[in-house]
């Protein structure tokens, strides 16, 4: 290995971006196969390869940061910029869904009956499960902040407790969302209302699952004493992501569930 005279981490060649891209291709193709041909084989293969990629990529990053000390303050600064840019790209991603929703709802076409919700659609009551889900995510935002403050103060017990509560609330949100989908009186194929509703809330639900997984990894790392008050970017990134998921849900609730109903 050549002598390094800078603070940057020169990453070794890794197969995980390639396997991650392959798993994304398998999952999206598998989702199409499931929708149109009721076959979950390709989707299951995609989920399996995605899970393996996540495990091995996280393992490598934990090794590089915690055990090899490659994540210097300069590297962490770069990672912070990367996470900020990623969240900005996610904001633009959801902007597209809100644009589609408002484009359809503010000037409904004659095919929709000239009204919103379209003729024949019975929207969900925003004061039932959606309101409960809103309170759950707001509570999880409080608990993740509690976890962050506990970590900064070196309070290991409260950090683990708060992080566990956040993950439990995330799982509870996902279960409630799944039950809401199961009982919804309309489907994804019920015109523009069904498609915008399920795609927007479905992608948000996917982000909650990803965020819960991210936080679960952070909990395991905290149990193994990986985080300190000045070296915990993995948790910080997960907390930023979780707050982003919270804010997106508030916009979804106000726009699609409350105003859109």
From Swiss-Prot:
Protein name from the UniProt record: Cytochrome c oxidase subunit 3
Protein family: Belongs to the cytochrome c oxidase subunit 3 family.
Organism of origin: Sus scrofa
Its EC number(s): 7.1.1.9
GO biological process, alphabetically ordered: mitochondrial electron transport, cytochrome c to oxygen; respiratory chain complex IV assembly
Quaternary structure (record): Component of the cytochrome c oxidase (complex IV, CIV), a multisubunit enzyme composed of 14 subunits. The complex is composed of a catalytic core of 3 subunits MT-CO1, MT-CO2 and MT-CO3, encoded in the mitochondrial DNA, and 11 supernumerary subunits COX4I, COX5A, COX5B, COX6A, COX6B, COX6C, COX7A, COX7B, COX7C, COX8 and NDUFA4, which are encoded in the nuclear genome.
Membrane topology value: Multi-pass membrane protein
GO CC annotation terms, alphabetical: mitochondrial inner membrane; mitochondrion; respiratory chain complex IV
Transmembrane residue ranges: 16-34, 41-66, 73-105, 129-152, 156-183, 191-223, 233-256
UniProt KW Membrane keyword: yes
């Amino acid at each position: 290995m050549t002598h390094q005279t800078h603070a940057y981490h020169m990453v070794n060649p890794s197969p995980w971006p390639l396997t991650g891209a392959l798993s994304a291709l398998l999952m999206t193709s598998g989702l199409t196969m499931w929708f149109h041909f009721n076959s979950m084989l390709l989707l299951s293969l995609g989920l399996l390869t995605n899970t393996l990629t996540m495990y091995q990529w996280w393992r490598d990053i934990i090794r590089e940061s915690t055990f090899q000390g490659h994540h210097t303050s300069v590297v962490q600064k770069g990672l912070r910029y990367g996470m900020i840019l990623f969240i900005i790209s996610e904001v633009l991603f959801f902007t597209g869904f809100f644009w589609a929703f408002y484009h359809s709802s503010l000037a409904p076409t004659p095919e929709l009956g000239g009204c919103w919700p379209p003729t024949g659609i019975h929207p969900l009551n925003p004061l039932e499960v959606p309101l409960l889900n809103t309170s759950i995510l707001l509570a999880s935002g409080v608990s993740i902040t509690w976890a962050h403050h506990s970590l900064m103060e070196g309070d290991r017990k409260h950090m683990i407790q708060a992080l566990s509560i956040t993950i439990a609330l995330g799982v509870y949100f996902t279960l409630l969302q799944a039950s809401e989908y199961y009982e919804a009186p309309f489907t994804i194929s019920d015109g523009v209302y069904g498609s915008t509703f399920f795609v927007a809330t479905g992608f948000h639900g996917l982000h909650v699952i990803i965020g819960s997984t991210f936080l679960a990894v952070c909990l395991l790392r905290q149990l193994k004493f990986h985080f300190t008050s000045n070296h915990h970017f993995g948790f910080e990134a997960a907390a930023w992501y979780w707050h982003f998921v919270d804010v997106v849900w508030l916009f979804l609730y106000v726009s699609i569930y409350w105003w859109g109903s």
